């Protein structure tokens, strides 16, 4: 089973509830949130602490230092190996997350085009000249679908997408397989809810992150090299707090960081919705209208119908 959908819809809690309900069958959770791969990035990614995981094994959490680069290809290999091992043990893998390319690469066994250092270097020079915002806008003109899935602040993935487009002469998404039967016959459950309801959840979520110590978490990670990280430093919340600290770290700068984090998360949710809604295999559930037990019933009903 895969549980996907926009940020803030309750995917992690549903995964825990489903795993508990499966009981004797055994279930293990495989993370598909790119920023939860990083050790120490806990508050800003809403990562479940160990004591909240109900004794259920979790995979692909805390596997990278913040100075390491997260790549879809590395994740695909590692997560697929985890899933194969879980299945071999007779248990049920539950993939959970909202990182669009990570999920598609895993469920559709995406093959990644080769890279060309000269082409990559040319786009990196262009990045240095015009900045990531202009480069992302260029990607949006060439391949709107790829731009929708890549954060406007994500220089590395923007460069990679433009490199693939130049090398293949096709949109970046064209290197993905056609949507067919998902790998491992995975049942894909989508969680979403009314925009007004989700906006309120995101506002509370953002406030909670700052109140629970996001600024202190970022400060500690800066001492471990966060600023040098190609992908970790650009994560929502972390990038905004870094900018606020660089500007003096006063109350006004941190207030702006909080507002920018909320606004950036809402924009990211729109991209997630656009991406996931194109996948006809997703069985959507209303996280705002259904009680947790009903969500579990619906998810397991869909899974049992297929399995």
UniProtKB/Swiss-Prot annotation:
Matching InterPro entries: Dimethylallyltransferase (IPR039657), IPT (IPR018022), P-loop_NTPase (IPR027417)
Record-listed substrate binding positions: 7-12
Marked site: Interaction with substrate tRNA: 99, 120
SUPFAM superfamilies in alphabetical order: P-loop containing nucleoside triphosphate hydrolases
UniProt-annotated binding residues for ATP: 5-12
Cofactor: Mg(2+)
Keyword field: ATP-binding, Magnesium, Nucleotide-binding, Transferase, tRNA processing
Catalytic reaction equation(s): adenosine(37) in tRNA + dimethylallyl diphosphate = N(6)-dimethylallyladenosine(37) in tRNA + diphosphate
GO molecular function: ATP binding; tRNA dimethylallyltransferase activity
Pfam family, one: IPPT
Class of this enzyme: transferase
GO biological process, one term: tRNA modification
EC numbers: 2.5.1.75
Record note on quaternary structure: Monomer.
Role this protein plays: Catalyzes the transfer of a dimethylallyl group onto the adenine at position 37 in tRNAs that read codons beginning with uridine, leading to the formation of N6-(dimethylallyl)adenosine (i(6)A).
Family: Belongs to the IPP transferase family.
Protein name per UniProt: tRNA dimethylallyltransferase
Organism ancestry: Bacteria, Bacillati, Actinomycetota, Actinomycetes, Mycobacteriales
């Amino acid at each position: 089973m895969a549980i996907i959908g926009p940020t803030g819809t309750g995917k992690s809690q549903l995964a825990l509830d489903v795993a508990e309900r499966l009981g004797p069958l055994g279930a293990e959770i495989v993370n598909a949130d790119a920023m939860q791969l990083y050790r120490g990035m806990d508050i800003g990614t809403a990562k479940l602490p160990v004591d909240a995981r109900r004794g259920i094994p979790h995979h692909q959490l805390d596997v990278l230092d913040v100075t390491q680069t997260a790549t879809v290809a590395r994740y695909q290999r590692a997560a697929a190996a985890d899933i194969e091992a879980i299945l071999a043990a007779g248990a049920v893998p539950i993939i959970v997350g909202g990182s669009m390319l990570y999920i598609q690469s895993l469920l559709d066994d995406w093959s990644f085009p080769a890279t060309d250092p000269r082409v990559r270097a040319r786009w990196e020079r262009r990045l240095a000249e015009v900045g990531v915002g202009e480069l992302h806008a260029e990607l949006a003109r060439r391949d709107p679908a790829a731009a929708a899935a890549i954060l406007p602040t994500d220089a590395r993935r923007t460069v990679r997408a433009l490199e693939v487009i130049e090398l293949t002469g096709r949109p970046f998404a064209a290197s993905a397989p056609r949507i067919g039967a998902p790998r491992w016959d995975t049942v894909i459950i989508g969680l979403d809810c009314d925009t007004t309801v989700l906006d309120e959840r995101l506002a509370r979520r953002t406030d909670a992150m700052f109140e629970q110590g996001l600024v202190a978490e970022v400060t500690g990670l800066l001492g471990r090299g966060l600023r040098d990280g190609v992908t970790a430093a650009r994560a929502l919340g972390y990038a905004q707090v870094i900018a606020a600290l660089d500007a003096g770290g006063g109350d006004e700068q941190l207030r702006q960081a909080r507002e920018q984090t909320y606004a950036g998360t809402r924009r990211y949710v729109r991209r997630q919705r656009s991406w996931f809604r194109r996948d006809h295999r997703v069985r959507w559930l209303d996280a705002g209208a259904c009680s947790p037990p009903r969500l579990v019933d619906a998810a397991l009903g869909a899974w049992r119908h297929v399995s």
